Amino acid sequence: PDGTMITTHGGGTSRKRMHAAKDYSGAEIMRTLRDEVLNRGIPVVDFTSAIELILDENGNAAGAVLLNMETGEKLVARAKTVIIATGGAGRMHYQGFPTSNHYGATADGLVLGYRAGAKLLYADTLQYHPTGAAFPQQIFGALVTEKVRSLGAKLVNCDGKVFMHPLETRDVAAASIIRECTDRNKGVDTGSGKAVWLDTPMIERIGGEGTIEARIPAMLRMFMNHGIDIRREPILVFPTLHYQNGGLDINVDGMTPNVPNLYVAGEAVGGIHGRNRLMGNSLLDIIVFGRSAGRNAAHRAAETVPAKLTLNHVAEFEAQLKAAGIETEAVSPKLLPDYRRK
C-alpha cells in the first residue's frame, strides 16, 4: 500500500533479494519487451530461425542463413554485426531429465557460434531447478517457482518428513531431492517415476488464507487446470533442466574474441556465473550483458564496412571433423526437439 517493493528470500541467499510480479515475472518481462518492439516498429520475422552464420572474407560475422519453418524457404540476412540470443538447451533432455524450457531451447546458438569459430565455456554444466512438476504427466517438468518455497512450503518425503532446508542453493536442493528418491528410496511413486512432496498448504498456514492466490496465482491456476488445489493439497516435484551455465565466450563488450562482430547475449553466453548461479542472477545475462552487447554491436555496426560474404567456415569445420576421425549423422542446429517431428 505504501509503495514499498515486496521482497523475499531465494535459495542460498542471506538477504531478501527477490522481487517479482506475483509469479508472472517472465510473462511481464516478455510483455514489456514485445510492447517496446511494437512501439518502435522493429521488424520481426516469425517462425524463421538461423541455421548457419555467415562470415565475410575477413572472418567477421556478417549475417546468417535463415529458414522459414512454415514454408521451408531459405533466406540470407546480411548484417554488419550479429547477436546470438538463442537461450538454453533444456530440450536436449540431458540424461533423460524433463525441462522447464520452451521448445526452441536446443542449444542452436552454441552450435552456430562454435562452427563459426567461437569458443565455448563450461558447456558441460547445466542447472537443474529443484522443483519441476512431477505430476500430472501433462505438466511434467514445468517450473514450480522458487517463490513457493520462499513463502513457506516444505519439501517432504514419502514418510511425511522434511528432509532438507527448503531454500538451499539449487544444486544442493536438486541433489538432495534426487538422493531422497534414489539412494534413500524415500520418493513417492508417480506412475512415471519418483518425486517428493512440496507442502503448499503450509503457505496459507503461515501467511493466512488467500496468500497463494495473491502471491502465486500462476501456480494455483496451473495445478487447478488439472484438478489439484494447491491451497489444500501438496504437489509432487522433481528436478527439471532449467538453465545452461555454459555457452559462448565473450569479452567485456559482449563480443566473441575469436569471431569479430559476433556478439552474444542472454543464456547463450558462457562464464558470466561460472559453473553455477543463484536464483535471479540469470537476469544479469540480459539486463546487464545483453544491454552491453546491443549497444556495442550498434556502435561497431556504424563503423563496419561490408565485405564479400562466404560460408568457407562450414567447409573448414567439416574438414576438421574428418581430420579428427569424427563421423556423425547428427544434423544441427536442431531448432526443435526430435519428438516434435514425430
Regions flagged by a language model, labelled:
Residues E36-V44, I54-G59, M69-R78, P136-Q137, ...:
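Solvent-exposed alpha-helices and their adjacent loops that cap or buttress functional pockets
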Residues I51-A61, V65-L67, R215-V269:
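A glycine-rich dinucleotide-binding beta-alpha-beta segment and adjacent secondary-structure elements
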Residues L112, A118-D229, E233, N296-A302:
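An anion/pyrophosphate-binding glycine-rich loop and adjacent beta-alpha core
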Residues P1-T8, G12-K16, D56-E57, V156-L167, ...:
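Glycine- and aromatic-enriched mobile tails/lids
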Residues T81-Q138, A142, G280-N296:
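Glycine-rich loop(s) and the adjacent beta-strand/alpha-helix scaffold that form part
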Residues P1-E73, R78-K80, A85-T86, H93, ...:
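Conserved redox-cofactor binding core of oxidoreductases
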Residues K22-M30, L75, H102-T106, V144, ...:
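Generic structural signal for well-ordered, non-membrane alpha-helical segments
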Residues P1-D2, V44-F47, L120-D124, S192-G193, ...:
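Flexible, glycine/charged-enriched surface loops at secondary-structure junctions
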